Amino acid sequence: TKSWLLENPQFNPYRFSFEKLYRKLTSRLRSLPDFIIIGTGRAGTTALYSYLIQHPSIAAASNYNKLGTAGTASTDIHFFEYMTSNNVQWYKSHFPILFSKSNIHKNSLITGEFTTTYMHHPDVPQRIFNLLPKIKLI
């Protein structure tokens, strides 16, 4: 019954979830992405990301479910469009924890994200460069 209460919008109007709370509390332990897919709507950006995360050395951002298909919530992170309302800790909360990335996978695991509207926002390239100057862009 607890999961039903959390999933029902009438009883959980603020969309509280234990997973989001855990990600927020562990955000300082999480890594930033190794790549960003910059695409546009209806151009195969989501399909490309789902193909990439099927590789065993690529971890999906947490807003993407384990099957490699779009989750029920928004799958795009939109961080670099709305940096004024979200901070870097919020952004990091979407990615794997550093020790799981380095110890379990012996530094071979990479992670990334995609947002289909980054191409349309004029401030996104400079914001990405300021935070992640060595990021790989796809």
Where would I find each of the regions flagged by the language model?
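ATP-dependent NMP and nucleoside kinases share a basic, alpha-helical "lid"
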Residues: 121-138
